[in-house]
Amino acid sequence: MRLAFWLYEGTALHGISRVTNSMKGVHTVYHAPQGDDYITATYTMLERTPEFPGLSISVVRGRDLAQGVSRLPNTLQQVEQHYHPELTVIAPSCSTALLQEDLHQLAAHSGVPPEKLMVYALNPFRVSENEAADGLFTELVKRYATAQDKTAMPSVNILGFTSLGFHLRANLTSLIRILQTLGIAVNVVAPWGGSIGDLAKLPAAWLNIAPYREIGANAAAYLEEQFAMPALYDIPIGVNPTLRWIELLLEKINAMAVARGVAPIEMPPLKAFSLDGMSAPSGVPWFARTADMDSFSNKRAFVFGDATHTVGIVKFLRDELGMQICGAGTYLAQHADWMRKELEGYLPGALMVTDRFQDVASVIEDEMPDLVCGTQMERHSCRKLDVPCMVICPPTHIENHLLGYYPFFGFAGADVIADRVYVSCKLGLEKHLIDFFGDAGLEYEEDAPASNVASGVEPSTPSVSSEVSASSSASPEASAPTPSPDGDMVWTDDAEAMLKKVPFFVRKKVRKNTENFARGIGEPTITLEVFRKAKESLGG
């Protein structure tokens, strides 16, 4: 067990609550010690919804354990009386799992009808956020999905959208807009916004859409096996993947339409998918060929995240923006094999699989790519390294839970991603220009002395100033070589001054390459001459 700080995935409780908090009429009771209700604060801070999270805690105290009593039955009664949920999900925390309590027996003593209770007693030490969320949603589908007649006209279920999902509402809106353009109705969206009654009517749809590898795919596979419902698992990230996604959707829907004697759906003009209905649905195809974006073909990108977004973004960056992929990885080991298959031919080396952010930061520092697409962790790491970074998946912070329409799915999503790539890379150039033209008043002086007027100190005379200046310039310490921030090599002042003229977003890479060059020729100190030789040797 590792200390749970800066982990990519949350606990099993976090995954369970993502599903239950997404649904209507579903409440969660955690059998846990005081303090595990931090999850409630997480939702109220990050989730941009007016509803309060449907989460309660059955507190376990030392005195209760000593007396052999449990608060769980009483807590379940209070939840039933106050919230009147259709279903209450009961789950243990890591602490209470050690007690080996029979939660089914405790729940039975609550007096709440058993059909309104569900004990989801997984092992919180072995199961993390995404696996717990996917497992619970699949169990709910198995419990409530009921065989029934299909809808008269083509309809689909959209599965896997959960609370605290990355750009959740915008992605869902993007998919629904595409479906409306095609004339396909949405039967159920679950778990987001769904109810127990909605889960019951899942088999009425013609097709299931499960774009997330992490949550929803197993539920779609169960519905396909039990109710012969075809499923679409492709990820509509990027212009061409979205076109293929629409083609596959129509192919599956029309196959069922022919069997049911319904007229097939024709592919509408691409303009119909645009926001105004008059222009191309995405500006990426022409924007990627502009002079402004042409330079991106030489830029290197590193991508790290969950399975769905890592695969989608790697393909988008290389296929549609022409960037070079210097590496990619994931913190979800259970999906690594699927990712290797999807990214075959895209990566220069092996897929990185780790849940240690330090390992990812080390790779970024070694590669020093022009762009990193990752999580909130990589954003922190890249800030220290002065490497441009854009967040593409959880874990995220408040700035990635937006009120506005910023999808990653569909044609509109392709535009959003392209904009973010462009801005993330170009802002570095802007900062360098501000540094470069600092004398024009575009930056603040870092070590500006306090005002003489404000401090009440009289200005020194020119003679005194000149003496101080002369003594400073004569001091041997003033021109002494300064050690590198990394502590490996020593740089002279003139070499350091020349290095500062290099744009900040490649400065660390230039420093590292110069030091490697100096070691190679046996120079312990980097002077201006050594710096120039390194520049010539490296093709600068």
From Swiss-Prot:
Q: Where is the active site?
A: D292 (proton donor)
Q: Where are the transmembrane segments?
A: none
Binding site residues for [4Fe-4S] cluster:
D36
Q: What is this protein called?
A: Light-independent protochlorophyllide reductase subunit B
Reactions catalysed: chlorophyllide a + oxidized 2[4Fe-4S]-[ferredoxin] + 2 ADP + 2 phosphate = protochlorophyllide a + reduced 2[4Fe-4S]-[ferredoxin] + 2 ATP + 2 H2O
Role of this protein: Component of the dark-operative protochlorophyllide reductase (DPOR) that uses Mg-ATP and reduced ferredoxin to reduce ring D of protochlorophyllide (Pchlide) to form chlorophyllide a (Chlide). This reaction is light-independent. The NB-protein (BchN-BchB) is the catalytic component of the complex.
A single GO BP term for this record reads: light-independent bacteriochlorophyll biosynthetic process
InterPro entries xref list? ChlB/BchB/BchZ (IPR050152), LI-POR_suB-like_C (IPR013580), Nase/OxRdtase_comp1 (IPR000510), P-CP_red_C (IPR042298), Protochl_reductB (IPR005969), Protochlorophyllide_Rdtase (IPR016209)
The organism named in the record is Chlorobium chlorochromatii (strain CaD3)
Q: What is the lineage of its organism?
A: Bacteria, Pseudomonadati, Chlorobiota, Chlorobiia, Chlorobiales
Q: State how it assembles.
A: Protochlorophyllide reductase is composed of three subunits; BchL, BchN and BchB. Forms a heterotetramer of two BchB and two BchN subunits.
